[in-house]
């Protein structure tokens, strides 16, 4: 089941509908509460994914006809980026749910979805998965099973620049704030490609190869006709989150 959403409220509503289908049609009735594991990509509140997770969590508990036993794990992917280093997270998850049958796994965002997919057979081979808040580019259909559902963002990257030009038509230069973690390097490539048609209209400067202090200095020296587009910054060029 694949659902695409363009807005955060729409995404949360679609995720709740998918969760209901997975929880109450793909699992058998039980007197025990429904056990749901939410997997976060980052180790701290990081918008928009933390906002999506918070809304989903609150609405799921509020609207469920049965008790929800909720578990949450944060992977801190900004710091732990090599898959060889994720064994402690696997062991923690194993200990967290030992002796308990999970009814649904909900990874929020693409990095947590990749982690869950890599370790699925080891941790929860028969549990349905609902991927929420990843972009459609990141989750190919072949990576899903018949027990999975996805509620994906459909990001219109050129629309970001179009919106800047609509709000500030005098803009001649845009600085793109984006970090240098693996996920940010992916998005830098996507942004560069999708922004290319506007290269003759705007000077586009990329901050992905700068430290945070260098970003601040560069931003402070920008001319009045420049705009800053903050896309994603979880790790700067020095590897500092």
Task: List PLM regions with ranges.
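Short hydrophobic alpha-helices and adjacent helix-cap/hinge residues
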Residues: 2-241
